[in-house]
Design a protein with these regions (language model features):
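Flexible, acidic loop-helix segments that line cofactor/substrate-binding pockets
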Residues: 243-245, 249-252, 282-297, 330-342
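Residue-level signal for inorganic ion chemistry
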Residues: 29, 50, 222, 246, ...
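An N-terminal boundary/leader segment
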Residues: 1-55, 267, 274-276, 463-469
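Immediate post-signal peptide segment of exported/extracytoplasmic ligand-binding proteins
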Residues: 57-74, 239-247
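Short helix-loop capping/hinge segments that flank enzyme active sites or metal/cofactor-binding pockets
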Residues: 70-90, 243-245, 301-363, 381, ...
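Acyltransferase
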Residues: 22-27, 55, 259-284, 308-323, ...
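Structural helix-boundary/capping segments
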Residues: 35, 112, 163-255, 266-275, ...
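Short glycine/serine-rich loop/turn segments
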Residues: 69-212, 249-251, 376-397
Length: 469
């Protein structure tokens, strides 16, 4: 197997036993990155530094300690997570040269485990969107079809993993930003329960909603990283599918979806039923009602506290930050919030109250039906073409791009629930479809174990066309 095809845990084992050299591994990933540089997954990198670190590891007289389980493994970091050795730009012009004084704690956890920082990945400007069509850093391209978006806002992280440039990456997720690009790029992306990982050192939009999330090509890798970042168990227990209870929220989570997406999802559900899973159809209009009164209000209000504070820490005013914004959709959002459409404190307080009702509704559905997880399409559609930033065509209608892309992921985010997207299969057009599972608040390890069991019975995706070429 080519070194760049190894999963995170496979690569770690091969490096630890010296079946694979650190320099050989790093050079394989760098070659893959250089070959697919046109996908525009990266904003900043230090390939020479990676090579030097790999050479030093190879020269060591003994194999890395068990206390360095990720020794020599390059991991990609979304460019809104602070790193002291590389700039943290947020994908916006005013911060392109901003160098934080210290790493985000989540980055330090990786480094303390021996990981190498592969570079900082492209994102939707300031993480304020779902396409990663960034006018400052350039459009990021989907490895399954480079004319299409990878999703966002953590698009570069998903592309780097899917295109075998790295075995794993960190993104951030406010309403979709890890799970959406994971779904559209055919990888696994996990949003933990809010607060499970350390949150300092992030260019926040909404501290109430934001969380770092790991991405990889299999659930085992994501689960291992979750254990590391949360200081929890590193390996998952085996879970039997027989008797698992999964809630299917028909209605808003399925209505209006692309028929090709639905076909893949229904086939996956049929497979699970054949394996003994109990699927419970749910009627959950309360989730949409509470969510509609919560999400954007929370983000817009908190963003106008968080962004000025981050800019000030970098020696910038909010006006200077806004002047450097290149993406029209992001500029519009910020201009509105700086003007007469700014969310009021009263509206924010009302949204927080509705969030509590949303959380209570989720808890009630899980308890009443004794559910292990909810299961539904991560996204109602496959990856749209680059440039469809405002409206997309879906099931015979023109619909708003951002709201459509995040429709299924946003409610769980607002409730702070753990959620994971894994590949369910490919459409007839050869585009990935993501299957999302959301767990009850705080059930992260059980959700990951359930998802690992489901992954074992679903078809494994082939490599993306650009990787096969």
């Amino acid at each position: 197997m080519d070194p760049h095809e190894l999963t995170l845990l496979e690569a770690a084992a091969a490096l630890h036993t010296r079946q694979l050299g650190h320099l050989e591994y790093v050079q394989a990933l760098l070659a893959q990155t250089d070959r697919l540089i046109s996908l525009n997954a990266w904003i900043s990198r230090d390939p020479e530094g990676l090579v030097l670190q790999a050479k030093a590891l190879d020269k060591a007289s003994s194999a890395p300690s068990e206390h360095l389980p990720l020794a020599g493994i390059p991991v990609a970091i979304k460019d809104n997570i602070d790193t002291s050795d590389l700039p943290t730009s947020g994908g916006t012009r005013s911060l392109l040269d901003a160098r934080p004084q210290r790493n985000a704690p989540v980055v330090d956890v990786l480094l303390q485990a021996g990981a190498l920082i592969a570079g900082k990945t492209n994102l939707h400007e300031l993480a304020l969107g779902g396409t990663t069509n960034n006018a400052v850093s350039g459009a990021c391209r989907n490895p399954w079809n480079p004319l299409r978006i990878p999703g966002g806002s953590s698009g570069g992280s998903a592309v780097a993993v899917a295109a075998r440039m790295v075995p794993a990456a960190l993104g951030t997720d406010t309403g979709a930003s890890v799970r959406l690009p994971a779904a559209l790029c055919g990888v696994v992306g996990f949003r933990p329960s809010t607060g499970r990982y350390a949150s300092p050192g992030i260019l926040h939009l909404s501290p109430t909603k934001d969380t770092v999330g790991p991405m990889a090509r299999c659930v085992a890798d994501v689960a291992w990283l979750d254990g590391l970042l949360a200081k929890d168990r590193l390996h998952l227990p085996n879970v039997s599918l027989k008797g698992l209870r999964l809630g299917i929220p028909r209605g808003d989570f399925f209505e209006g979806a692309d028929p090709q997406v639905l076909a893949v999802i229904e086939q996956a559900l049929d497979t699970l039923v054949a394996e003994g899973v109990v699927c419970v159809t749910l009627d959950v209009p309360d989730l949409k009602q509470h969510n509609d009164a919560t999400g954007s209000t929370l983000v817009m209000f908190e963003m106008m506290q968080s962004l000025p504070a981050y800019a000030k820490a970098q020696g910038l005013s909010m006006d200077a930050l806004l002047a450097g914004v290149g993406s029209p959709d992001v500029a519009r959002i910020l201009s509105r919030q700086l003007g007469h459409e700014r969310v009021t404190a009263a509206a924010y307080a009302a949204a927080l109250a509705r969030r509590q009702k949303l959380q209570a509704a989720y808890a009630r559905h899980f308890a009443d039906h004794r559910l292990d997880a909810l299961i539904f399409p991560t996204c109602l559609m496959t990856a749209p073409l680059i440039g469809q930033d405002d409206r997309v065509h879906l099931s015979g209608r023109q619909v708003p791009t951002f709201q459509t892309l995040i429709r299924n992921t946003d409610p769980g985010s607002n409730a702070g629930l753990p959620g994971i997207s894994l590949p369910a299969g490919l459409t007839a057009e050869g585009l990935p479809v993501g299957l999302e599972l959301d767990g009850a608040l705080g059930t992260d390890r059980h959700l990951l174990a359930v998802t690992a069991a489901i992954e074992r019975v679903l078809p494994r995706l082939p490599r993306p066309p650009v990787v096969q070429a």
